[in-house]
Amino acid sequence: MLTSTLLAAATTPLEWSPTIGIIMVIANVIAITFGRQTIKYPSAEPALPSAKFFGGFGAPALLATTAFGHILGVGIILGLHNLGRF
């Protein structure tokens, strides 16, 4: 009984496309920009190998901003898929 209810609620799978990749990249850029403005200690240890390339971020700040960017991106992509845009 529970299995049939779960199968009835399942949506169609989302196919990857370049549009989805672009949305994820834009979401990560927005998150990194937001993190650059709001993180109190962006250059906390451990440092990254090329600090200038990563905008002066340490490993914790880079991981935090990209994780936040992926959460934003997934929310945008799944929200648009739920609305029928993809």
Swiss-Prot record:
Propeptide: 1-8
InterPro entries registered for this protein in UniProt: PSI_centre_PsaK_sf, PSI_PsaG/PsaK, PSI_PsaK, PSI_PsaK_bact
Primary site of residence: membrane
Subcellular location: Cellular thylakoid membrane
Spans through the membrane: 14-34, 60-80
GO cellular component, one term: photosystem I
Keywords: Membrane, Photosynthesis, Photosystem I, Thylakoid, Transmembrane, Transmembrane helix
Pfam families in the record: PSI_PSAK
Topology term for the membrane: Multi-pass membrane protein
Gene3D superfamilies linked to this entry: Photosystem I PsaK, reaction centre
Family of this protein: Belongs to the PsaG/PsaK family.
Protein name as catalogued: Photosystem I reaction center subunit PsaK
Organism: Trichormus variabilis (strain ATCC 29413 / PCC 7937) (Anabaena variabilis)
